[in-house]
Curated annotation (Swiss-Prot):
Segments of this protein annotated with the region Loop 2: 78-92
Transmembrane segment boundaries: 138-158
Keyword terms, alphabetized: Biological rhythms, Cell membrane, Disulfide bond, Glycoprotein, GPI-anchor, Lipoprotein, Membrane, Signal, Transmembrane, Transmembrane helix
UniProt xrefs under CDD domains: TFP_LU_ECD_Qvr
Annotated source species: Drosophila persimilis
Residue ranges listed under propeptide: 129-160
Pfam families noted in UniProt: QVR (PF17064)
Stated name of the protein: UPAR/Ly6 domain-containing protein qvr
Amino acid sequence: MWREKGNAIGNWLLAITAIFGFITLIWIPQASAECQTRSIYCYECDSWTDARCKDPFNYTALPRDQPPLMTCNGCCVKMVRHQRSRYEVVRRMCTSQLQINLFMVDHVCMMESSGNGHMCFCEEDMCNSSKDLYSHGHQLHLIITIAVAVSWLMGQLLNR
């Protein structure tokens, strides 16, 4: 009996590992390559010199009343310093202006250790206009949810 349970658990763990391996092989290189090879439009501004760059961003304004757009061969970036204070600074740009490994930043937000600022990356046209770029990174959550559901189903099938 213990041997059968051990084999079932081993099979279940093997299935989970295979699923996560498959997802990693397909999803991560695709996302990284997409960010590096496709041209998108990003806002280019700094709230120190252009009040239109501040949050909340008025994306319904006429194009002439918005910060300039630039063609970007990479990802859009939004950086915030001194968040939620009167000294808040917002900068929007393209990763081509940064020395950064795109594989490490695709669909990611990094927080300052003090919690007073963050830097987010996204890969859709004008996506750095968003107040909260976390909304652009739901793909990872979806993949993890699907993987857990498939693992649970496989575990149920293996236990029959």
